[in-house]
A protein has these predicted regions:
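Iron-sulfur cluster-binding electron-transfer modules in prokaryotic oxidoreductases
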Residues: 1-162
Length: 162
């Protein structure tokens, strides 16, 4: 495996960024920690890339922790888009294959690579994400509050919840 642990990955990214003169990317906070309730999603299987944050463990939603050892690939996009897409496609198809209804992105970087670049990920894996989609934490919270986020229309992977 190319990046066995996150420390090795971080060092490799740092090395490539220095060589290629790429500015450090913004750090994205884990938006999953902002979720306050999930009563309407008890019947859904929700995949998350990493471990379940403590604030979500009390909810009765059916979370599937992918515990991905590899990063989503976002930091590699400018240096090696093909490798970034391979990393991301492994994660999104692990979520798809797990039987999850959707993947919950923990930040904008994950949303960008998993949804905005979904067609490239499908091509990279030579597979189709039929009837699968990605949600932002803010969109999930809005849906929980019976609101329809306007951004759902802009998703590459079309959201079909109800």
């Amino acid at each position: 495996m190319l990046f066995e642990g996150s420390e090795i990955y971080s060092e490799a990214i740092k090395f490539f960024k220095e060589i290629l003169g790429i500015q450090a990317a913004l750090k994205y906070e884990n938006e999953l920690e902002k979720i306050e309730k999930l009563s309407k999603f008890k019947e859904f299987k929700i995949a998350i890339k990493d471990k379940l944050p403590a604030n979500l463990s009390a909810y009765k939603a059916n979370f599937i922790e992918l515990n991905a050892k590899t990063p989503c690939g976002y930091d590699l996009l400018k240096a090696d888009e093909e490798l970034a897409c391979k990393l991301a496609s492994k994660i999104i198809f692990a979520a798809f294959d797990s039987g999850a209804d959707f993947l919950l992105a923990s930040n904008e970087a994950e949303f960008y690579i998993f949804d905005t670049l979904a067609k490239k990920l499908e091509k990279s894996a030579n597979r189709n994400l039929q009837d699968f989609y990605v949600l932002r934490a803010s969109e999930l919270m809005a849906l929980e509050n019976s609101e329809i986020p306007s951004g759902l229309k802009e998703h590459v992977l079309k959201v079909v919840i109800i």
